[in-house]
Structures are given as structure tokens and as C-alpha cells.
Amino acid sequence: MSKVKNLLAKMLQRFGKNSSQADSQRYDSLEEIAQNQANERMLRATQVGLEEHLVICLETEAGSFYWHSQ
């Protein structure tokens, strides 16, 4: 449940950011790239049957978010 709360907090932060801050946008872009790569690795592992966990995908305007049960 804490993962879901953290995910929602991140999404709310993205929606509430001021678009005039170039440094934070750059940081967000790097963070988003890293998150997308982690999401893709997890999704690939799930698709090839390496993990037998529930995978949930939440698609928003801020991006797609994946997490799985452990």
C-alpha cells in the first residue's frame, strides 16, 4: 500500500510543478527516463514469465506507472 501512496504522491507533484523551472524539468526528465527503463525491464520480465506477480499499470497524462505485488 505504501508503494501506491508514493506513486500517487509523485503523480501529484508532477501535476503541480511550475513549468518555468528548467533545472527541475531536466531532473524530472532524467528521473522519468530512469523510471521508464525500470518499468520496461519489469514489464519484460513479467511477459516472459520470470515473475508470477500481479502487475498493475496506471496510465495518466504524467506518464505510465507500473508496479507489482511481491
UniProtKB/Swiss-Prot annotation:
Coiled coil: none
GO biological process: cell fate specification; negative regulation of Notch signaling pathway; nervous system development; sensory organ development
Tagged with keyword Lyase: no
Keywords attached to this entry: Developmental protein, Differentiation, Neurogenesis
Gene Ontology molecular function terms on file: ubiquitin protein ligase binding
Result of altering Q21H: In strain: NVIII-1, NVIII-2, NVIII-5, NVIII-9, NVIII-18, NVIII-22, NVIII-24, NVIII-41, NVIII-42, NVIII-46, NVIII-m11, NVIII-m12, NVIII-m13, NVIII-m15 and NVIII-m19
RNA-binding as UniProt keyword: no
Protein name stated in the entry: Enhancer of split m6 protein
Native source species: Drosophila melanogaster (Fruit fly)
Encoding gene, per UniProt annotation: E(spl)m6-BFM
